[in-house]
From Swiss-Prot:
Gene Ontology CC: cytoplasm
Record-annotated TrmE-type G domain positions: 218-363
Annotated protein name in UniProt: tRNA modification GTPase MnmE
Protein family (similarity comment): Belongs to the TRAFAC class TrmE-Era-EngA-EngB-Septin-like GTPase superfamily. TrmE GTPase family.
Record-linked HAMAP family: GTPase_MnmE
Protein function: Exhibits a very high intrinsic GTPase hydrolysis rate. Involved in the addition of a carboxymethylaminomethyl (cmnm) group at the wobble position (U34) of certain tRNAs, forming tRNA-cmnm(5)s(2)U34.
Keywords of the record: Cytoplasm, GTP-binding, Hydrolase, Magnesium, Metal-binding, Nucleotide-binding, Potassium, tRNA processing
Subunit and interaction comment: Homodimer. Heterotetramer of two MnmE and two MnmG subunits.
Length: 439
């Protein structure tokens, strides 16, 4: 990122108007800025009530000013926060003053966090956890983000990297000093036994990645069935608002509709699909095609069957995993045991039980485990490459020790790419672009 030596500023709180706005400043000119705006530098990490003035001594506003000397700040640089009234006019006036100071500019997306990374205050996993915490909408997303941003996952990767480094050091010592008494005997046996245990630990960790992805990106539930089975009515009932158009005309839904739900702290992505049948209308044919794609990608299928006219499309007879839901219970007199659950969107009967069932399915598959798990595809990719390098090192028992040691070096490098301990310059712009300006 260019201009890392500039001093930067940005609004780090919500958009105005608001009761209070927080302006964040970071860089070598922070002290000079405070002298110009409030007349002096407040005591470190102490809130001081000050009047903020222009260079012409005109008051802009009054508020709390805090100074954080580097390296003991979020960014590792001298930094400050100005807590002022959240008026658009007040912010515009303050930004004019800041923008007119040479060497001071508005921050770019994620630049405060980028500087924290560059100055060793955060690693990449912690940065991503912070971004996820800011964007968290469910309780499980919050918990996962806290685990990542607090360094719990990074500590695991660092400990694994240390084991790889020690293994390489012991092997190289044996290669360089084969006759020295202070090199432990049978070092190869010790190293490869530990590497086998490490491989097992990483494999188990990688298996948990699906839980991290579900918590972060959502558990996909697809509502499917024949036309007029009540799919759109169920989506509207679970969303508690009108997401889909509901009519008595078969084939009303032509596209895949989507709504996010919070069920027991998990993000559940609910999809309403076109009724599955042999369609002739070109638009409906495309809708049915998209419905089949959604079914293929689903974590759970709710197979809806109109109990007053039970039809199960052939596409859905073998759909797994699925829950068979009988609909329009208010229109039948005799209950049937062929359904996992029976509901009526008209009366609301069975809807709480359906929400509970979805929650149980998610928790049975992904709950009850540590949240120190991979949460992003790039984590999975690097862990898989690390595992492959370890496999190569362990399995090539007859190979030259130097070649096997090189595989251990590659395994450590892939781990380092997750946290940013090794060169990941090409990743940084992508990662930090996820932040808003003031973070």
């Amino acid at each position: 990122m260019a201009m890392l030596n500039d001093t930067i500023y940005a609004l780090s709180s919500g958009a105005p108007p608001s009761g209070v706005s927080v302006i964040r400043v970071s860089g070598t000119l922070t002290r000079d800025i405070l002298f110009q705006l409030v007349g002096s530098v407040p005591a470190a990490r102490t809130a001081s009530y000050r009047t903020i003035r222009t260079r012409y001594d005109q008051p802009v506003d009054s508020g709390l000013v805090l100074f954080f000397p580097g390296p003991n700040s979020f960014t590792g640089e001298d930094a400050a926060e100005l807590q002022i009234h959240g008026s658009k006019a007040v912010l515009a006036a303050l930004f004019r003053e800041l923008g007119d100071i040479p060497g001071v500019r508005m921050a770019m997306e994620g630049e405060f966090s980028r500087r924290a990374f560059e100055n060793g205050k955060l690693d990449l996993v912690e940065v991503e956890g912070l971004a996820d915490l800011i964007g968290a909408e469910t309780e499980m997303q919050r918990r996962l983000a806290v685990e990542q941003s607090a360094g719990g996952v990074s500590a695991i990767y660092d400990s694994w990297a240390e084991r790889l480094t020690r293994a390489r050091a012991l092997i190289e010592a044996e290669l360089d000093f084969p006759d020295e008494d202070d090199v432990p005997g049978s070092v190869s046996d010790m190293v490869w036994a530990d590497m086998a245990r490490l491989r097992h630990d990483i494999a188990l960790h990688l298996e948990a990645a699906s839980a991290g992805e579900i918590i972060r990106d959502g558990f996909k539930v697809v509502i499917a069935g024949a036309p007029n089975a009540g799919k759109s009515s169920l989506m509207n009932a679970l969303a508690k608002r009108e997401v889909a158009i509901v009519t008595d005309i078969a084939g009303t839904t032509r596209d895949v509709l989507h709504v996010d739900l919070d069920i027991d702290g998990y993000l559940v992505k609910l999809y309403d699909t076109a009724g599955l049948r042999e369609a002739e209308d070109r638009v409906e044919i495309e809708g049915v095609r998209r419905a089949r794609v959604a079914l293929r990608d689903a974590d759970l299928v709710l197979l809806l069957v109109d109990m007053s006219n039970p039809i199960i499309p052939a596409d859905l007879e073998q759909a797994l995993p699925h829950v068979t839901v009988g609909t329009k219970k208010d229109l039948i007199e005799t209950a049937s045991d062929r359904y996992d659950l029976q509901i009526s969107t008209t009366t609301g009967e069975g809807l709480p039980e359906l929400r509970d069932l979805i929650g149980r399915v998610v928790k049975e598959r992904y709950g009850g485990q540590s949240l120190a798990i991979p949460s992003r595809q790039r984590h999975k990719d690097s862990l898989a490459k690390c595992l492959a390098a370890l496999d190569a090192a362990i399995s090539q028992g007859s190979a030259n020790l130097e070649l096997r040691t090189e595989q251990l070096r590659l395994a450590a490098e892939y781990l380092g790419r997750i946290t940013g301990r090794v060169d990941v310059e090409q990743l940084l712009d992508v990662i930090f672009s996820e932040f808003c300006i003031g973070k």
